[in-house]
Amino acid sequence: MSSFTKDEFDCHILDEGFTAKDILDQKINEVSSSDDKDAFYVADLGDILKKHLRWLKALPRVTPFYAVKCNDSRAIVSTLAAIGTGFDCASKTEIQLVQGLGVPAERVIYANPCKQVSQIKYAASNGVQMMTFDSEIELMKVARAHPKAKLVLRIATDDSKAVCRLSVKFGATLKTSRLLLERAKELNIDVIGVSFHVGSGCTDPETFVQAVSDARCVFDMATEVGFSMHLLDIGGGFPGSEDTKLKFEEITSVINPALDKYFPSDSGVRIIAEPGRYYVASAFTLAVNIIAKKTVWKEQPGSDDEDESNEQTFMYYVNDGVYGSFNCILYDHAHVKALLQKRPKPDEKYYSSSIWGPTCDGLDRIVERCNLPEMHVGDWMLFENMGAYTVAAASTFNGFQRPNIYYVMSRPMWQLMKQIQSHGFPPEVEEQDDGTLPMSCAQESGMDRHPAACASARINV
């Protein structure tokens, strides 16, 4: 199991009575007296560990292979490596990242059905054998570049109920699957299993049932062709926050019976999945600062207000946008909600408002319309559930830098991490509720002790 130490990244252990929100407020207070009120994240690594415990309870037969593309921050990958997850990598760079943290090759699946030949060769030279394919061309590339590969056939699914659809780009049909299996046999390439992905943000858990059923058909085809498959990869699409229509346990309550029906526990089939946002979405909170403000009246050009009155509306410009962390709005169909760092007065008036990013592109709009009390330059806004498909795809367009990330973890979670490293997961460990986890802010296990003010540490990613 990979190590989890201070040397890898800076993480502060929270003292009893402190929460990640306290660290966020503290950091805001620290920078508020300076001119450099840059956007930043606070990320709770303990939240990721709690998600893992929840996974073990809800999907006991399924081994998670974290989708690195979702958030490739070193601290995230290191945390997941330390608790024993596998990793879904899509490129040479992602493979280098996880193997650089000591993750063995057998805990990596190269889950990209369309790979560059040089990167297939890199995987071969570094012991990564499991990889996906969905076409004859890919089979031929692998046969030449990595003949000892253990291939996983990616099949298409009905992802019409997903927010982000993937089967339009990846996946073989059932008819094509037989042809590909026959061709793999001719090329003497080993096909060990089937993978699918129902799409990100799936709103119908029954989609998983059909996909598992289709996978069973392909397993049976493989037996007829002469393969002995033993791996099923059920992909991703699991929610990572509680603000979704479909909850995680609602999905798993449908998946588990389907797995038991088509791939019973005595079938000898290993089952894995590729969760990404599930692990990281809720761990990250982003703080942005208002850098400019504009008052707009209904009759003024550029106002979208349909209100008959001449009441003013406000445009707020903040120091992160769709070319940075909020790229999730464009590419991940995210709907974000601004929270106020300062609690408004009970009788405070609210105005129709819009929120814009810092770049010179008119497309850089974060929130088209929301109701906010009047705010001012220098005030802060918070955005929760910002861990998935945000930092990984952020650019520096117009010269705006990516936000720094400040990592924290509660003392109980830290102690559990050390126990896992030393002795593995304790028997019958159960997910602990947030309310039973006192958050602490001091260092232990050789880490420097900080004063009760609970200063946070910075890591650049």
From Swiss-Prot:
SUPFAM superfamilies: Alanine racemase C-terminal domain-like, PLP-binding barrel. Its cofactor is pyridoxal 5'-phosphate. The keyword Heme does not apply. Inhibited by antizymes (AZs) OAZ1, OAZ2 and OAZ3 in response to polyamine levels. AZs inhibit the assembly of the functional homodimer by binding to ODC monomers. Additionally, OAZ1 targets ODC monomers for ubiquitin-independent proteolytic destruction by the 26S proteasome. Pathway: Amine and polyamine biosynthesis; putrescine biosynthesis via L-ornithine pathway; putrescine from L-ornithine: step 1/1. One of its GO terms (molecular function) is protein homodimerization activity. Its EC number is 4.1.1.17. Substrate binds at Y331, D332, D361. It comes from the Eukaryota. The modification N6-(pyridoxal phosphate)lysine is found at K69. Homodimer. Only the dimer is catalytically active, as the active sites are constructed of residues from both monomers. Does not form a heterodimer with AZIN2. Belongs to the Orn/Lys/Arg decarboxylase class-II family. This is Ornithine decarboxylase. The gene is Odc1.
